[in-house]
């Protein structure tokens, strides 16, 4: 068996223990929160799902984590509306998990603001690390196979309600998040910020 085959086998194995799955899930949340905090601090761009909270955080007296929590709660409400009777009440667990995730973002932002980011190469390096951490966080969240955050849950609900493939819905959803963020930025600030 080649090394690549061993890695594929390892990553495709389900995690059997609930406690271990929760640890992996929270590791994913921590990685994603660090990613959001890093990308916000560099000022070079955010992930599509974080664009709206990042832009709004320059306009309203709320933290990035608080805005993220509010937006994700709205996403959960939309999931319930789209799925109607197919909405599983266990999905309400997304609320406390999102609260913890939002809290992580707010706790990591002050740390990220202390990192050296005076020059473009430093900013670029931190932003690339942020992209890697985001990918790692999403991987760990999926690997935990426990619960998704509302940002992914809403896309799953849209795909199911529209009877469209998830990848197409994800691209359309992410694109719409960026477009809305750009509009908010130009209308509210007069220039591009947080996208």
Walk through the language-model features, giving the residues of each.
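Core subunits and conserved enzymes of cellular information-processing
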Residues: 1-195
């Amino acid at each position: 068996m080649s090394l690549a085959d061993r890695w594929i086998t390892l990553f495709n194995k389900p995690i059997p223990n609930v406690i271990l799955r929760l640890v992996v899930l929270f590791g994913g949340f921590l990685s994603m929160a660090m990613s959001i905090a890093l990308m916000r601090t560099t000022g070079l761009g955010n992930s599509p799902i974080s664009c709206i909270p990042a832009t709004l955080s320059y306009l309203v007296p709320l933290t990035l984590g608080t805005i993220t929590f509010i937006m994700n709660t709205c996403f959960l409400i939309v999931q319930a509306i789209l799925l109607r009777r197919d909405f599983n009440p266990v999905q309400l667990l997304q609320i406390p998990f999102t609260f913890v995730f939002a809290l992580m973002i707010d706790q990591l932002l002050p740390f990220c603001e202390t990192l050296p980011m005076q020059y473009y190469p430093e900013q670029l390096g931190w932003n690339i690390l942020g992209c890697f951490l985001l990918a790692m966080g999403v991987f760990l969240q999926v690997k935990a196979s426990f619960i998704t955050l509302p940002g992914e849950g809403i896309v799953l609900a849209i795909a199911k309600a529209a009877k469209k493939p998830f990848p197409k819905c994800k691209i359309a959803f992410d694109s719409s998040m960026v477009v809305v963020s750009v509009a908010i930025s130009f209308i509210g600030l007069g220039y591009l910020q947080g996208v």
